[in-house]
Every structure is written in structure tokens, then in C-alpha cells.
Amino acid sequence: MNVAIVGATGYGGIQAVNLLKKIKKYKISFLGGNKTSGSKWNENFPFIYLDNDPYIEEISVDNISKNADVALLCLPNGLSSTLTRKLLDRGLKVIDLSADYRYKSLDEWKNVYSKEAAIYKRNDDDLCKEAVYGLPEINKEAISKGRLIACPGCYPTSALIPLVPYLSQGIIENEGIVIDSKSGTSGGGREPNQKLLLSECGEGLSAYGLINHRHTSEIEQVASLISGNKIELLFTPHLVPISRGMHSTIYGRLRDPGLTSDDCRILLDNYYRNFKNIKVLPVDTFPSTKWVKNTNQIFLSVKVDIRNGRIIILSAIDNLLKGQTGQAIQNLNLMSGFSMDEGLDLTNNFP
């Protein structure tokens, strides 16, 4: 299976190269990056050494499609949409890591990503409707049959996996859900950003994107589909001075206030017992980003506050792996007919 990595020099693309080079069932057929096109891969990334030391090539439909079966688009929001239809028309399957196809309505995307919509004049509502939301834990069968996969955002991944079992079975109320998340700086990408400078964000913690963060509507869209009811929730992200890692604390109201922490843990464990990358921790053991760093795992924990009938669900992921490229490889595996976790048995180098 030949895979083109488009946008290979960003954090998502770099992770993709590092993962795919170790999976013998795949061959990297193209490395695309306009800023570094014409230079050799090992010259730019000697720490992810490729034996054939390929050139990084200019991003174009012709270059991408000449030898590829699948295109992994690791591009900024909006840019993926300029390539997707042309690649599909040439018979390639597409896995998109941007937000371009996460919404079932192009109008919704334009509303949320208005800045990008002003630059990229899209008319591919049909592809928005066709795209499969690439969260394997809820869409495994659809992903395996799809030709266009929209990989979830990192925050939605860290929030939806803990929420899905309780929403799908009506354990928690649809109103009053609060998500409090923290992300490492790599979530902001590789482009220079003053807010991500060490002297700006080091030794500090700050919230951003209150009320109107783009991932709020993405979480709400999927949560509403899962629950069968319209859900509006409160999501607040924070930036923490670590390079990679994401932690979410989710609060909800139990429909049955008699449920205990053990009850809710058993439900969570049973729901995900067939997913080897999901670890449900014992009651009173709470996940740390240290435990999942450099892995595709998600650690979950749950606690019930019996005083007020609230449930607290916690999750920890590596935002560049389960929150981004590792999840994309899970989707690639499913589309290729392989085990979902092929090549993703990654070791955490604690501490």
C-alpha cells in the first residue's frame, strides 16, 4: 500500500513518517512540503532517518497521485479542500487531518472557519456529506468502507471517547456538560507563534478560546448524533507549558443519582473492552499525560460525586498521536483491511 504524506514537514506529517517507516505493509511514496521542496528528507530530519533519503517534493495533484493509493493530508485548514476532490477523482483514498470535512454541512464549516472560508472558495458540500468522521471507537465499520476520512481534532478526541458510552446509553443528562481541557504547545502547530514562545508560555498556564473555540461545535455535532438529541455544552481549553500531551476533565449530571463510581467504571470498561488502545483505570487512579506520551493510547478514569449526582470523567492522550496522526494511522489500517492498531504498539518512555 503506497501512501503519500502531504505536508510532511509539519508536526502531523513528521509523526506520519516516523510511524509509517516502521510498518512494512506501507510504503511512503511521496513526501510533500512546499517550503522545503527540492531538499533531501534526512538533511531536514536526521532524527527520523529514511534509508532511501527521498526528496521532499512540491505539493501538486500530479506529484501526489503518481504512485500513491492513499493520500494523508497533513495540511492547514482550508488547503486540504483544494486537493481532495482531484485526488478522489484519480482513484486515491484520502485521510484528512484538517477540519475541512469534519462537518456534515459546508455552511457549518464556513461559519466556524470563516477566516479560511474567505480565502478558500469551496463548493464541495457533497464531500462534506460523504466524509466519514474518523473516530474508530464509534465509526469503525464506516471507516473501513470509506474513501474520504475526516480525522477528528485533538480536543474532540479527548472529550468524545470518554463521553460516548454515557451519552449513547442515556446515563448522563444532555444539558450541563462541561469540558475542561489542557493541551501542550505542539497543538498549535509548527509555524512561529508568539504565544508559544518559551518565554511567553513557560512556567505558566492560561485559558483561551472561551465560549467560541472551534472545537466546541465539532464536539457538539458528534455528541448530538450519539445521544440522538441536540447538545450544547461548555468547553474551555487551556495551554500548558509541555511539548505534547492533552488532559480533559469532563463534568455531567447523572440521570440516576444512585450510580456509584464503580458502576460507571464498569460501564466504561465494558464499552471499550475490545479496544486495546483504551485503558480504563481503577477508581481513584487518575490519568497523567506522562503515561501516554509517545503512544496512541488514551487513559480514562471516572469518579462520581454522590453529594450532587455529578459524574467526573478524565482522559489523557498524546495530542500528536491519538489526538492526530496515530488516529490517522488507525483509520488507514481500517481502510486497508488491516488490524486497527497495526504498527501502533508504541512504548512510553517514562519518565
UniProtKB/Swiss-Prot annotation:
Pfam families: Semialdhyde_dh, Semialdhyde_dhC_1. Its EC number is 1.2.1.38. The keyword DNA repair does not apply. One of its GO terms (biological process) is L-arginine biosynthetic process. It comes from the Bacteria. GO terms for cellular component: cytoplasm. It is found in: Cytoplasm. The active site is at residue 154. Its main location: cytoplasm. One of its GO terms (molecular function) is N-acetyl-gamma-glutamyl-phosphate reductase activity. Gene3D superfamilies: Dihydrodipicolinate Reductase, domain 2, NAD(P)-binding Rossmann-like Domain. It catalyses: N-acetyl-L-glutamate 5-semialdehyde + phosphate + NADP(+) = N-acetyl-L-glutamyl 5-phosphate + NADPH + H(+). InterPro entries: AGPR_AS, AGPR_type-1, NAD(P)-bd_dom_sf, NAGSA_dehydrogenase, Semialdehyde_DH_NAD-bd. CDD domains: AGPR_1_C, AGPR_1_N. Pathway: Amino-acid biosynthesis; L-arginine biosynthesis; N(2)-acetyl-L-ornithine from L-glutamate: step 3/4. The keyword Protease does not apply. It is an enzyme of class 1 (oxidoreductase). Keywords: Amino-acid biosynthesis, Arginine biosynthesis, Cytoplasm, NADP, Oxidoreductase. Belongs to the NAGSA dehydrogenase family. Type 1 subfamily. Catalyzes the NADPH-dependent reduction of N-acetyl-5-glutamyl phosphate to yield N-acetyl-L-glutamate 5-semialdehyde. NCBIfam families: argC (TIGR01850). HAMAP family: ArgC_type1. This is N-acetyl-gamma-glutamyl-phosphate reductase. It comes from Prochlorococcus marinus (strain AS9601).
